[in-house]
Amino acid sequence: MLAKRIIPCLDVTNGRVVKGVNFVELRDAGDPVEIARRYDEQGADEITFLDITATSDGRDLILHIIEAVASQVFIPLTVGGGVRAVEDVRRLLNAGADKISVNSSAIANPQLVSDATGKYGSQCIVVAIDAKRSSAPGEPPRWEVFTHGGRKATGLDAVEWAKEMAARGAGEILLTSMDRDGTKSGFDLELTRAVSDAVPVPVIASGGVGGLQDLADGIRLGHADAVLAASIFHYGQHTVGEAKAFMAREGIPVRI
C-alpha cells in the first residue's frame, strides 16, 4: 500500500494565514513563509496553499508569496486561488508551485481542466471541491458543490462533479466538507467515502479535523489517500510528526 500523506493547509488572505469556521469567522494564524517552513521541518509530505478570497475579490495571483514560500520549502507545494486560465497555471509553476488547484474556474469553464492537464500533465492539476450536504434527514445522502470560497451554490452534485473532473484529467481531488470546516468534529466520512469510491484518482480529505483519530478515520473509514488539516497544526495542538507517529501506530503506512 502506498504511503498516506499528511498535508497542512495554509488558507491565505491579504498575505496572512487565516483559519475560519464553516468558511467564515476568519482568525489570523501568522506569516505564510514562517508557517510553511515550520511544517517542512516537522516532516509534512506536502503543503497546500489556498488564497481563499482571490476569486471572490477578483484579485490576481499572489506570486510573490508563492516565490517566497517555494524558496524556503522543499516538499511539494500545491497552490490554489484565483487560477482562471492555463496561463495562470504556467505562472504559478514558474513561481515554484508543484501542483495547481482549481475550483471556481473549473466550474465556470470545465475545459480549463482538460487544457491544463493536456499541457502540463494530470500530476500537477488538483481540482478542489467544496461540498455541503443538501439532502434532508432520511433521504439518500447528497452534497452540493459551492464556489467562490463557499459563497455561491452551483446546483452540481459533488460525487458526479468529482467523476467528471477525473474524466477530464484531474490528477487529484481536494474534497472539503463545508459543514465540517473548522468545527473540529471530524471529516464528513460519508462524503469522503462516496467521492473516494467513485473516482480512480487520489482524494484528499479536508474539513473538520479536531484530533489525530480524525486523520486516521479519514484514511481508514473515508477511503481517502491523503488527509489535510489546518487548525490542529496552526495553533500548536499537534505537530505533523505526532500525527505521523499516531498513524503509524494505527497501522497506516506513512513516511516517517
Curated annotation (Swiss-Prot):
Origin: domain of life: Bacteria
Catalytic reaction(s) noted: 5-[(5-phospho-1-deoxy-D-ribulos-1-ylimino)methylamino]-1-(5-phospho-beta-D-ribosyl)imidazole-4-carboxamide + L-glutamine = D-erythro-1-(imidazol-4-yl)glycerol 3-phosphate + 5-amino-1-(5-phospho-beta-D-ribosyl)imidazole-4-carboxamide + L-glutamate + H(+)
Identification of the protein by name: Imidazole glycerol phosphate synthase subunit HisF
Catalytic residue list: 11, 130
Main location: cytoplasm
Job of this protein: IGPS catalyzes the conversion of PRFAR and glutamine to IGP, AICAR and glutamate. The HisF subunit catalyzes the cyclization activity that produces IGP and AICAR from PRFAR using the ammonia provided by the HisH subunit.
Pathway membership, UniProt: Amino-acid biosynthesis; L-histidine biosynthesis; L-histidine from 5-phospho-alpha-D-ribose 1-diphosphate: step 5/9
Molecular function (Gene Ontology), one example: imidazoleglycerol-phosphate synthase activity
